[in-house]
Amino acid sequence: MNPLKTEVAFATPWFEVLAKTMKPGEAPYYSLRLPDYAAVVAITEDQRVLAVRQYRPAVERHTIELPSGLVDPGESPAEAARRELLEETGYEAAEVEVLGSMEPDTGRLGNRIWTCVATGARRTEGRVPEEGIEVLTYSLPELARATAEGEFNHALHVAVLLVAMVRGKLRLAPPDAITIAPAAPPQTQR
């Protein structure tokens, strides 16, 4: 079902609020239109994953997340991944592979997040991370622990890590060492 009418209800340099009329006489459905962005699983030459710690005004605290940023007009997700990696961490990658994209929130957002894996990442001489960003490195077990304990908890970036794992780009343990606990039977809501 396509909207009968779509109007920009509010606009900023970073996003637009859209009002979509779905049926005559009904109140509009509101959603956000944002640019796509790329998140980078950057693996250093010594097999550590880069992360950044930065203050996020939306949640009013520092967060730990993957290097990421908007895909600029005319830029590919791989180019955005390389640029953001360099800007946020001061690292350059030997290779960047785009694994695909996901829709961050199909009920509210009209954009995509691109999963990129950068390998052979090394610090570029003379480059420093953006002001206010602390660069962190994790081994895969350390990153798994940080995720399990809620230290690394950007939901979309956890999803990006999962995509990298299921595509075989990150291996936490040999496949035969991973076990899945039996699930409890589903409970019916009454």
Regions found by a protein language model. Give the residues of each.
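Acidic, metal-coordinating catalytic segment for phosphate/diphosphate chemistry
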Residues: L4-V41, E45
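Extreme N-terminal tail/first-helix region
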Residues: M1-A11, I180-P186
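Acidic pyrophosphate-coordinating catalytic loop
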Residues: V8-P13, Y30-S31, P57, M102-I113
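Unchanged
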Residues: A27, D36-A39, T44, G69-L156, ...
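A glycine-rich, hydrophobic loop/mini-helix early in the fold
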Residues: Y37-S68
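Short helix-capping/linker segments at secondary-structure and domain boundaries
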Residues: A164-A177
